[in-house]
């Protein structure tokens, strides 16, 4: 599972979940990607579960890039504990995903295989997603 090697502070405030994603909105490494449409927290366990679902479907073919990382700790107090007495212990790690963010990228397989693998991965995640293809940036060509 994904988690940071070391952090400056053990516990953090809950992150903002408003607005659209500032970066990571385009397919850069692979040919196909899975893009978030809604906002949510994604835990390291959900990311790992989605990765396993994709790689099992694709068997030995293709390459998968995970474009999100769970940097933020989330805490939880034990059951039946009264309020106060400090912040709870770190329960796990989350990645805040906003609309437009590319979650996973795939290359080296056909579009049908990539579409199905990413569909299986999307069922493991708490966000609505869509399948996107890499867009070649159209610029001026130097051919004359």
From Swiss-Prot:
GO molecular function terms listed in the Swiss-Prot or TrEMBL record: rRNA binding; structural constituent of ribosome; tRNA binding
InterPro entries, per database record: Ribosomal_uL16 (IPR047873), Ribosomal_uL16_bact-type (IPR000114), Ribosomal_uL16_CS (IPR020798), Ribosomal_uL16_dom (IPR016180), Ribosomal_uL16_sf (IPR036920)
Keywords: Ribonucleoprotein, Ribosomal protein, RNA-binding, rRNA-binding, tRNA-binding
Biased composition (Basic residues): 1-19
Residue ranges, annotated region (Disordered): 1-23
Pfam families reported in the protein's UniProt record: Ribosomal_L16
CDD domains linked to this entry: Ribosomal_L16_L10e
Family of this protein: Belongs to the universal ribosomal protein uL16 family.
Name listed for the protein in its UniProt record: Large ribosomal subunit protein uL16
Gene name of the record: rplP
